[in-house]
Structures are given as C-alpha cells and as structure tokens.
C-alpha cells in the first residue's frame, strides 16, 4: 500500500522509522553491498539543506536513500559531525525543529546508512580541515561519489583519489 510522501523532516523521520519497524529485518551485508547500487558519502551541508527545506534535491536524496537507490556511507566521526551541526540552535531554528527531533532523525539515518571503519587517515588532503572526515569516510568506504554543496574544497583531493564529486541534484539525476 503506497504511503503519502512525507513533506518535512519530522514526517520523513517518522516514515523511515515505520518502514524499519515494519520490516524488522535489515538487509544482509551482501545485499547492502550490491555493486549496482552506488555508494556515496553525504557531506554535512547536504543533510543541513535537507533539514532546512523539503523542496530541494538534498531532501529528495533522503527519499532515495529510504528506497535503497544508493548506499549512504557513514563513519563515527562523520556521524558526530552531523549531530553537532544539526543540533546547533541556528540550524534547529531554521528547520523549525528541536534537538530531540534532530537526534531521532539521525538515529533513523544510522539504520539506513552503512557504517565505515576508518582504517587509514589521509590528512591533510582538503582545503578545509573540517572536511577531512568526509573524505576519509568516502575513501575507507569505497564510495564512488561524494555528494556536497561545496565542491571547491574537495576538488583537488577528489581528483587525486578518482572520487566523483556531485551536487545533490546531479547525484539524484544519476540515480535515474
């Protein structure tokens, strides 16, 4: 039975939670690592954009993740970065959320994402030291794509490691 498409972050978080509770089984490791499904890391600015507006490509990527159209890779340092940024008072106010809803959203995001253990630290590679954890998650997780709204800071490192940089809209279009 098709569900109504959620139109804000709170509704999407709840829909993701219902999906997870309804299925009660997570896909096997083999199923999660299918070579036909692109592996990507979402930069923090993509999640911030999704939290601020349900109208853009960043928010649409969350639906694509929910529908398993790509594998989102996340490491512990990157998850902590997501939480720190999404819980900032100015981010909560901009997205009309509270800290509890941000944490619930990230809890569900963790259920859908594939964890990456950072075996190698490649620092320094990016123009902004705060972006290193994003790049390291992509490299250690075998991502094909790093999805960001800030391609400039990653451009040289991405070229060195043959990592595709795409904005949310470009990545969404590449999913078909």
Language-model features: locations:
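Acidic, PIN/NYN-like endoribonuclease modules and their adjacent C-terminal/linker elements
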Residues: 2-20, 27, 132, 139-145, ...
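Short, well-structured N-terminal submotif of metal-dependent ribonuclease cores
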Residues: 1-74
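Active-site neighborhoods of divalent-metal-dependent phosphate/nucleic-acid chemistry enzymes
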Residues: 110-146, 151-153
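Short, flexible helix/strand-to-coil boundary loops that buttress conserved ligand/catalytic motifs
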Residues: 51-52, 86, 158
